[in-house]
Curated annotation (Swiss-Prot):
This is F-actin-capping protein subunit alpha-3. Expressed exclusively in testis and sperm. Highest expression is found in the neck region of ejaculated sperm with lower levels found in the tail and postacrosome region. The keyword Phosphoprotein applies. It comes from Homo sapiens (Human). GO terms for biological process: actin cytoskeleton organization; actin filament organization; barbed-end actin filament capping; cytoplasm organization; spermatid development. Keywords: Actin capping, Actin-binding, Cytoplasm, Cytoskeleton, Phosphoprotein. The modification Phosphoserine is found at S290. The gene is CAPZA3. Disulfide bonds: none annotated. It comes from the Eukaryota. The lineage of its organism: Eukaryota, Metazoa, Chordata, Craniata, Vertebrata. One of its GO terms (molecular function) is actin filament binding.
Length: 299
């Protein structure tokens, strides 16, 4: 069935689904390609706006406001396609297709102990990110849910090399409740890479974590939290590199329904691992092996 015979509602669903499949750094390219097929500017603009908003949340798209990095995520969404930045105390809309902030408004925040703690933790997190990532960005967000205060740390680094036929993203988030004495940190680390020379290879690797953290005072908590993030990300990177090294031709044949064509001889695995290392920059630590890799090959 072609797009021309689909109802408008079905077209909207297909367009949005295709746009949401765009890898990090490739949303605008996917949108432009679809525009050539759809040839309905109004429909594409509306779906691009909706899908772009979701894409920003999914991949923690970084912005810069007043010289400070801002990571977009569902944790700082306000509704009506708006985001909120604690640092600048601004709310805004972001047009991913035009890479432009829109409808910027001031937005006050409550200055309480949780806010002071957020600022201290952000300073410690910035020191860690600047030391471990080539072009890393981080945010520390605060949220109140049922009268309980939560702090959310977000980290992102990417390297989009479309000219070299690959893109890579590393992101993580860490959430904990502001409690006296002891709190539980829930974390998730996510890596995605896309290679599109000769074959189309998508790699997604993620890991969920839970760790306890003692709370004595703000300074101690900030240092302990940054140390926890460093240890867990180091372990994760070491496990990722070990797992990628196991993706030899023999291992790939076992997960493929058919052998790769002759063009597989052009794949330079050493270069791929070297390129990935530019994205996954944290220093190596102890290895915790975790098998959670999804590889999709489209010949």
């Amino acid at each position: 069935m072609t797009l021309s015979v689909l109802s408008r509602k079905d077209k909207e669903r297909v367009i949005r689904r295709l746009l949401l499949q765009a890898p990090p750094g490739e949303f605008v390219n996917a949108f432009d390609d679809l525009c050539l097929l759809i040839r309905d500017e109004k429909l594409m603009h509306h779906q691009g706006e909706c899908a772009g908003h979701q894409h920003c949340q999914k991949y923690s798209v970084p912005l810069c406001i007043d010289g400070n990095p801002v990571l977009l995520s569902h944790h700082n969404v306000m509704g009506d396609y708006r985001f909120f930045d604690h640092q600048s105390k601004l709310s805004f809309k972001y047009d991913l297709l035009q890479n432009q902030l829109k409808d910027i408004q001031s937005h006050g925040i409550i200055q309480n102990e949780a806010e002071y703690l957020r600022v201290v933790l952000l300073c410690a997190l910035k020191l860690y990110v600047n030391d471990h990532y080539p072009k890393g960005n981080c945010n520390m967000l605060r949220k109140t849910v049922k009268s309980k205060e939560y702090l959310i740390a977000c980290i992102e680094d990417h390297n989009y090399e479309t000219g070299e036929c690959w893109n890579g993203l590393w992101k993580s988030k860490w959430i904990f409740q502001v409690n006296p004495f002891l709190t539980q940190v829930t974390g998730r680390i996510f890596v995605q890479a896309h290679f599109f020379r000769c074959v189309n290879l998508h790699i997604e690797i993620s890991k969920d974590l839970k760790e306890s953290l003692e709370i004595v005072n703000q300074a101690q908590l900030a240092l302990s939290f940054a140390r926890l993030v460093e240890e867990q990300e180091n372990k994760f990177q070491a496990a990722v590199l070990e797992e990628l090294q196991e993706l030899s031709n023999e291992a790939l044949r076992k997960i493929l329904r058919r052998d790769l064509p002759v063009t597989r001889t052009l794949i330079d695995w050493h270069r791929i691992l070297s390129d990935l290392n530019l994205v996954m920059y944290p220093k190596l630590g102890y290895v915790i092996y975790s098998r959670s890799v999804l590889c999709n090959w489209i010949i």
